[in-house]
Amino acid sequence: MARMTDASPYLDFDRDTWRALRKSMPQVLTANEVEKLRGIGDRIDLTEVAEVYLPLSRLIHMQVEARQKLTAATEAFLGNPPTHVPFVIGVAGSVAVGKSTTARLLQVLLERWESHPKVDLVTTDGFLYPTAYLKEHGLMQRKGYPESYDRRALMRFVTDVKSGKPLVTAPLYSHVSYDIVPGEFQEVRQPDILILEGLNVLQTGPTLMVSDLFDFSVYVDARVDDIEKWYIDRFLKLRHTAFREPGAHFASFADMTDEEAYVQAREIWQSINLPNLIENILPTRVRASLVLRKGSHHLVDRVRMRKL
């Protein structure tokens, strides 16, 4: 049974209790598919998919179907023809915590259900201001903070998707050049489900925010010390991959020694990523519909689900 207290807005599940909620849902991914979805440093395997993500997929599927029925009932009451309203999911969490892998897994799992086969995934990276703008406004050291995003454009994008526009576009971002890709866009054409993944998607404010348009949200959580270690480990590995690609923004880091790279990564973490986590990202955790809590092994060991 889930642990529940009147004082908490959440139901708490240990891993054994949560995995039982998979019920009879079959495994729909292969080891090769999981390998392709896994991010650098992640340890997700078929067992993690079966015990954590299949139950989550089942929960979201049930909520999508319930929302579809509610929308149909409302339109019938109003005497309107059926309308297509995408179900919007937000996925939030710190850099290096594994939220991108979580979002990719959810996309693949959710599109296997017959009632919502079209699932689009968009990251908020595309709504960062271009590097030239960030430099001009002194925001390069604040990249990833709320003010470094074009929040109006992001809000307009989600609103347009939610309202059922036939075609909506999102800018593309390159992690190699560390900048927006000029003239390139991701097309979103009336999906059944839209997954929006990013650091600050659960932010609130005095006016309408994208989080107000979410039907469900996931926060990927872990101890700060563990996230720091994962960030540094990932940085060290990137010296041999992305940092060596043509046009890489961080090419100067590629030939650093382990000691030099460790010092550089820790400085970036301490000066940029950690303050952003503490000031902006972590405070939004309480708004999530569900929290996936990872242990030091980078695998989920607890799940917290908001009471409905």
UniProtKB/Swiss-Prot annotation:
<keyword id="KW-0547">Nucleotide-binding</keyword>
<dbReference type="GO" id="GO:0005524">
    <property type="term" value="F:ATP binding"/>
</dbReference>
<dbReference type="GO" id="GO:0015937">
    <property type="term" value="P:coenzyme A biosynthetic process"/>
</dbReference>
<dbReference type="Pfam" id="PF00485">
    <property type="entry name" value="PRK"/>
</dbReference>
<dbReference type="GO" id="GO:0004594">
    <property type="term" value="F:pantothenate kinase activity"/>
</dbReference>
<comment type="similarity">
    <text>Belongs to the prokaryotic pantothenate kinase family.</text>
</comment>
<dbReference type="InterPro" id="IPR006083">
    <property type="entry name" value="PRK/URK"/>
</dbReference>
<keyword id="KW-0963">Cytoplasm</keyword>
<protein>
    <recommendedName>
        <fullName>Pantothenate kinase</fullName>
        <ecNumber>2.7.1.33</ecNumber>
    </recommendedName>
</protein>
<dbReference type="InterPro" id="IPR004566">
    <property type="entry name" value="PanK"/>
</dbReference>
<keyword id="KW-0808">Transferase</keyword>
<dbReference type="InterPro" id="IPR027417">
    <property type="entry name" value="P-loop_NTPase"/>
</dbReference>
<keyword id="KW-0418">Kinase</keyword>
<keyword id="KW-0173">Coenzyme A biosynthesis</keyword>
<dbReference type="GO" id="GO:0005737">
    <property type="term" value="C:cytoplasm"/>
</dbReference>
<comment type="pathway">
    <text>Cofactor biosynthesis; coenzyme A biosynthesis; CoA from (R)-pantothenate: step 1/5.</text>
</comment>
<feature type="binding site">
    <location>
        <begin position="93"/>
        <end position="100"/>
    </location>
    <ligand>
        <name>ATP</name>
    </ligand>
</feature>
<keyword id="KW-0067">ATP-binding</keyword>
